[in-house]
């Protein structure tokens, strides 16, 4: 009798920059217990993928775990899979890096396990048709993605119990369709339900393919209790063992070598079903969700659903400009570095070592995991980008004092940017708002301006409609939830923090605010802006002045008061020295309208990552702050200097002005989804320096603001 081939594939990953205690928890709750249970059941032969961050972690902290893996590989119980070393979205990194990252992980597996992997895990299953050419160049013979990809190309469920061939430029690879049904059954439903699914294939030579995250076996909410303490995994393996007369567990590679393909297929650009929803614009995402729910209630819903597709992964770059800027900064530097074959440098001095880490996918997108919303993950990517850029520039500039300037549309948004560098820092200016988007302290590898804008997400309506279940009620839920079903909240009243910004939270943003000014309205971005300078383009001019580089921004705009529009002009110049971490900004405002009043404000957004940590705080010389945390809220008058101190990273951000100002300070906090539900996250400290202006025709106002970084 023909047996059902049960192909069980697990993918384990932790992002670059994740905290060590998070990795240790994942190891204790998922990676180690899974392998310990697997060892007890030699009948279970599976495929497994660990990303490079985990290989590094195991080598540094748990070499004994690697020894266990070697034993299972030698016994044929584990098939190791390769992939991009730092889990990049392969489709959006340079082709040489596609191959380079895969080969690096393959080499690591060869060195540690003594085998050469045939198969590859595709990060986030983000498929694009050009990939086979580069996968084959890297030595990959097969990959596994989702059956969703195949269904979008017209295939049915019954067509997906094996693998298909696809190619690009004649380079052929084998592609397995992982079952969506099994992905939702395992390990959230009783093992018997999975066996029932497999039994439908009984008597055939079909394959049932499970391929999903290993973190769902212990890390996802409540799964450690269900999978190990209640014994789901052992019961599942025992159940398979009792039915070996008609089920044959085997690694994907064994099946690929033994069985013929089901046919040829060409797959459209896609990821898994949920990712295609998350990548949609917010309003479209909400509508898409409603359509999918309606289809579930329709008798023909399943048939129609095959032909409905969501978004496209690359649109995260359109959805989140912060993600796009980081991605394009990495690409821009990669182009400068060029082909590794032309360079001979020690590994520790190779900028590609760091640039590859900056390609790690997690902080470039957001779904129900924290992703982009987690500041420490964004910081880790910038940290590696800054290190790579510093190594590259060190080789380009032998002198101690130098300054470089580039004018270009580096991020493809249709507007001009200026990248300005000296040995101590990197600055990124945007013509939009004449703003500063990035300020890198090279000595600390730290972008101090990495603040995320507060945006409406498709899932926020769950909070607004009060359909959030308290995490305290989780224990009363009989069935373990998948990560996609969780709408719990880490604290009550999070809907009160749902404020959305009308502009990007950059720095040196120019505000005109009418009297009476209201702090709360401004903090919530629910105030009335009189000027039109926040999002409109400024004209750019650059000049070299001795050892200083100057960047001039000019915009003639208008001030809307009492339905009248009066002309007003802002000229601001940024002066940067050749060997310091400071930028001096001089403003000149010229008013051409009728006599009146307004308040001119300069907004800066600074992110030192920890809003409530005692070692990160405000210090205002000569003033006592009852609450000096970076997440504190307050208003002060007659201020000329503000310090934001980071004792952990041993740096201090200093803000000075030559005219005493009023100061508002408040945290930028987002409400986003994570693995365990809704959470509030500190994204940065917002500071508004403002001055009341008596407007007169032809009148001018001048002020100088200096932003600098010092080491502690």
Predicted regions and their residues:
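Gly/Pro-rich turn-and-neighbor structural signature
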Residues: 96, 111, 115-116, 121-166, ...
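CE4/NodB-like, metal-dependent polysaccharide N-deacetylase domain
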Residues: 97-124, 199-210
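Beta-strand-rich recognition/accessory modules
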Residues: 409, 525-571, 578-586, 592-593, ...
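Polysaccharide-binding surfaces and accessory modules of carbohydrate-active proteins
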Residues: 581, 590-663
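Alpha-helical scaffolding within the catalytic cores
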Residues: 32-33, 60-75, 154-167, 192-200
């Amino acid at each position: 009798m023909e047996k059902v081939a049960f192909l069980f594939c697990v993918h384990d990953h932790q992002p670059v920059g994740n905290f060590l205690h998070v990795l240790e928890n994942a190891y204790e709750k998922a990676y180690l217990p899974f392998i310990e249970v697997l060892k007890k059941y030699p009948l279970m032969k599976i495929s497994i993928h660990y990303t490079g961050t985990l290989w590094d972690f195991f080598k540094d902290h748990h070499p004994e775990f690697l020894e266990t893996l070697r034993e299972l590989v030698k016994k044929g119980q584990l098939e190791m899979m390769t992939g991009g070393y730092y889990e990049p979205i392969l489709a959006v990194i340079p082709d040489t890096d596609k191959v380079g990252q895969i080969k690096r992980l393959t080499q690591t597996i060869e060195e540690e396990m003594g085998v050469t992997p045939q198969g590859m895990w595709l990060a986030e299953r983000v498929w694009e048709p050009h990939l086979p050419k580069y996968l084959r160049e890297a030595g990959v013979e097969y990959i596994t993605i989702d059956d969703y990809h195949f269904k979008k190309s017209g295939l049915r469920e019954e067509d997906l119990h094996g693998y298909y061939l696809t190619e690009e430029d004649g380079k052929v690879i084998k592609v397995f369709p992982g079952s969506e049904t099994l992905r939702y059954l395992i390990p959230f439903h009783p093992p018997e339900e999975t066996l029932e699914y497999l039994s439908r294939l009984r008597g055939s030579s079909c394959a049932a393919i499970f391929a999903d995250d290993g973190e769902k076996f212990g890390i996802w909410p409540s799964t450690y209790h269900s999978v190990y303490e209640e014994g789901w995994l052992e019961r599942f393996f025992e159940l398979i063992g009792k039915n070996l007369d008609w089920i044959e567990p085997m690694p994907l590679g064994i099946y690929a070598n033994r069985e013929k393909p089901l046919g040829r297929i060409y797959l459209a650009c896609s990821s898994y079903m949920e990712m295609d929803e998350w990548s949609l614009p917010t309003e479209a995402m909400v509508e898409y969700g409603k359509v999918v729910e309606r289809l579930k209630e329709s008798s023909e819903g399943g048939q129609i659903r095959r032909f409905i597709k969501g978004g496209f992964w690359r649109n995260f770059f359109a959805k989140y400009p912060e993600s796009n800027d980081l991605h394009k900064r990495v690409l821009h530097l990669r182009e400068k570095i060029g082909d590794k074959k032309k360079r001979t440098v020690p590994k520790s001095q190779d900028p590609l070592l760091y640039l590859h880490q900056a390609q790690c996918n997690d902080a470039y997108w957001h779904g129900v995991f924290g992703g982009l919303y987690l500041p420490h993950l964004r910081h880790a990517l910038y940290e590696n980008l800054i290190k790579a850029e510093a190594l590259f520039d060190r080789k380009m500039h032998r002198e101690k004092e130098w300054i470089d300037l580039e004018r270009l549309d580096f991020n493809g948004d249709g507007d001009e940017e200026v990248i300005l560098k000296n040995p101590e820092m990197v600055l990124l200016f945007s013509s939009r708002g004449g703003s500063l988007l990035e300020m890198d302290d090279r000595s600390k590898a730290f972008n101090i301006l990495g603040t995320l804008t507060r945006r409406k997400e498709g899932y926020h309506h769950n909070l607004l409609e009060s359909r959030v279940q308290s995490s305290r009620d989780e224990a009363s839920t009989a069935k373990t939830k998948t990560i996609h079903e969780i709408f719990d909240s880490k604290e009550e009243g999070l809907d009160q923090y749902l404020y959305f910004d009308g502009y990007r939270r950059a720095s040196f943003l120019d505000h005109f605010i009418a009297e009476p000014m209201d702090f709360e309205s401004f903090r919530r971005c629910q105030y009335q802006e009189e000027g039109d300078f926040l999002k409109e383009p400024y004209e750019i001019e650059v000049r070299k002045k001795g050892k200083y580089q100057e960047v001039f921004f000019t915009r003639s705009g208008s001030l809307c008061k009492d339905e009248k529009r009066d002309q007003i002009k802002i000229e601001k110049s940024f002066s940067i020295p050749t060997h310091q971490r400071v930028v001096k900004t001089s403003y000149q405002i010229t008013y051409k309208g009728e006599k009146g009043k307004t308040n001119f404000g300069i907004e800066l957004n600074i992110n030192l990552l920890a809003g409530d940590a005692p070692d990160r705080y405000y210090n205002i010389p000569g003033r006592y702050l009852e609450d000096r945390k970076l997440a504190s809220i307050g208003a002060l008058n007659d201020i000329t200097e503000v310090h934001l101190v980071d004792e952990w990273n041993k740096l201090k951000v200093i803000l000075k002005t030559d005219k005493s100002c009023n100061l508002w300070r408040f945290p930028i906090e987002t409400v986003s989804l994570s693995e365990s539900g809704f959470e509030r996250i500190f994204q940065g400290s917002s500071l508004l320096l403002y001055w009341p202006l008596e407007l007169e025709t032809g009148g001018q106002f001048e002020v100088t603001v200096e932003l600098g970084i010092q080491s502690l």
